[in-house]
């Protein structure tokens, strides 16, 4: 997202400084939901230092182009039906976690088709 350099992510602490990412990253394209990360304390808050184990998920970010066109809730509904975890961001932007058990190729093909029609902008995040 233009002008945004960091974000807060939900995570489950599984050790002193190890966490499982529990939300879909909008900004950080090096992380995905389900990754196990090692964090360091900076200014009283945890910050990701490195990925310890990849969780197997990929992340895509979708921005609907035409307010009169594709409804973000319809896109989210389709992604949910494919088994993705979906979060809504500012301006109707969606971030989706495509799990290892989801049909990633079909999802990518469908989203690429919407992008080719000019209905959405597509920005990949971390791809497993």
Positions of PLM-derived features:
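Short beta-strand/loop turn elements enriched in aromatics
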Residues: 1-14
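Short, structured beta-strand/loop micro-motifs enriched in basic residues and often containing a Trp
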Residues: 13-23
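Short, Lys/Arg- and Gly-enriched loop/turn segments at beta-strand edges
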Residues: 42-54
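Helix-rich terminal scaffold detector
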Residues: 67-128
